[in-house]
Amino acid sequence: MSVAYLIKPKEKKYWELLCKPHLDGYIYPLKFTGKKMTIAQAKDQYENELHDLLVHDSIKYIICCDAEFYKALVAKAKPSVEIGTIKTTKDGAFKITYCPSPLSSFYNPDDFKHKFELVYTAVQKHIAGTYLDPGQGIITTGIYPKTLLEIKEALNSLHKHRKLTCDIETFSLKFYEAGLGSIAFAWNEHEGIAFKIDKSPTEQNTEVRKLLKEFIETYKGKLIFHNIAYDATVLIYQLWMKSLHDTKGQLDGLDYMLSNFEDTMIITYLATNSASGNELGLKAQSFEFAGNYAQENINDITKIPEDDLLKYNLTDVLSTWFVYNKHVGTMLKDNQGRVYGFFKKILSNIIQMQLNGIPIDMKQAKKVAKQLEQDEQDALKRIHSNKYVAEFTSKLRYKAMNKYNLTHKKQKTLLDFDNTFNPNSPLQKAELLYEDLKLPVVDTTDTHQPATGNETLQKLISRTNDQDIKNLLQAFIDYVDVVKINTTFMPNFLSCPYDEELKWHFLFGSLHLGGTVSGRLSSSSPNLQQLPSTGSKYANAIKSFIKAPPGWIYCGLDYASLEDHVSALLTKDPNKLAVYTDGYDGHCLRAYSYFKDKMPDITAQLDEIEKEGKIFKVTHDDGSVEFLNENNPKLKEILNESNKHT
């Protein structure tokens, strides 16, 4: 069979073991000069070495197991959603498809097996002349109502279906700017409807919105979403809420949207989660069904023709059905039903948190922003005024001058060059610190280069006695700290929307359930979990403008040592339970358990207590707790008093 496998040399034996028995062919190990091949390197290797060799060997099909190499050979390649899709190389010489590395079978064998089956089935079908691109022909019934009457009739016809998948397309990812571009419903993997709603981001179609709201309020079946935390947040705000903090509208919307729903993203998470992680996106989970149907301009739906947008929206809901059918059985088989039910309850809290947002005192935020900008400029000034940076800047200019003069007849002088040190460049920082200043390399990056992050710089401060170097390192640390806040967080704070009703600004973000292997919440736009916290130089500055509007109270709740409570209840360990039943300090108890030899005074005191007799825990009427020795007169007095009343 004229099939070529392009793989990394170290993967050859695994490919021969796992894959070659299913689909015979020839292995062509790729040449790697580093940890990862660049597209330019891949292109050069293909054009100067592989192409002629493949032609000579009469190869017709390529199975490429390296994403960068695949991108070099295929136009507009998206490897993760083109597994098992037969493409043509840019030069038209070969048919090609992408397959993940066989090494992935060691940490996620079922996933690799599934994807490899897609690959070899696609190649076999293409050779036999029966291949169809994924996604071709999946829409057997696509209804696209245009007029108000057609939309009303289409929505009425949906009431007969017990389950519907649903998806919306919006003008923005921010719910308060999103509008409602279009919506789609499907009753199986091949049949559904999709229709336009708002004409533009600023022009609402109130009549269609009214019909949609009435349908959701009266539909008795189950609505299935992929990531309902986004769709429901947008729909609740756009259909039920009259302002950013219309509490009645918010609660009404929550009741209707979450009365009977499923979320295929959570189902996928529970069915596929492993230590190696997983891809939860709808496109990634349905690529073998729908293919790569992503629209290039989906971030701005105004650039997509209406017919294309509606077909795209419909494909989303058909794919949601596919993902539901693909994973719901696995989730239930793995006894994850109760966990799923718990996650569904949590989604209600997440959606409400996303709609409520964080109150921001804009006047104070602007004041803090001004101070942060000043801190950034101060740090830059300290960096550029440092004598070692001045010397390095001169070196940069000399290098630029020499490079120019080597290739030009008309020579330039040093005054013609204004190169300056760039503190945002890891390469320049590494050259300055490790080559010029000869500091020791205490940490390296993933690519084995000397690290220049703040944790590394903090270590380096103690590795030199030169005060100018210490000052420079501290200036770097201060600069990075403040720049991160100024570029990542402050733009979000300063641009957050104003609520006319409460006369206050609010910051809104997205929370993701199932976005981590551990199950912890994750956050984006902005990442609220990375806000400067206790211990950070700017924690108090940020907290100073997170403030409730006049007449309101902003409060926070947190579990007290939640993990320790759970551990004590699950293990029934007497010492762990004693922390809560007898009022011990958990940290002290653990410290003594681990390091008894370091605490002879405590050991001696415990020995003396044991000699004196048993210890009793006494809880007084006011709730206070006291531990008394059996020979303590106070204990005897308490016992005598207690006996009088029994």
Predicted segments with their positions:
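A polyanion-binding, active-site-adjacent surface
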Residues: 1-133
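Short, intrinsically disordered, charge-balanced linker/junction segments flanking boundaries
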Residues: 22-23, 180-184, 630-646
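Acidic beta-strand-to-loop metal/phosphate-binding motif
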Residues: 60-67, 165, 220-231, 554-556
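Metal-dependent phosphoesterase core characteristic of DEDDh/y 3'-5' exonuclease domains
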Residues: 74-86, 90-106, 112, 186-190, ...
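Conserved "right-hand" nucleotidyltransferase catalytic core of DNA-directed polymerases
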Residues: 128-199, 247-254, 277, 288-289, ...
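Nucleic-acid-processing active sites and adjacent nucleic-acid-binding tracks
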Residues: 188-223
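Conserved, non-catalytic sequence blocks in retroelement Pol enzymes and Pol-derived host proteins
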Residues: 225, 272-275, 557, 579-582
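Generic long, charged, amphipathic alpha-helical segments
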Residues: 586-641
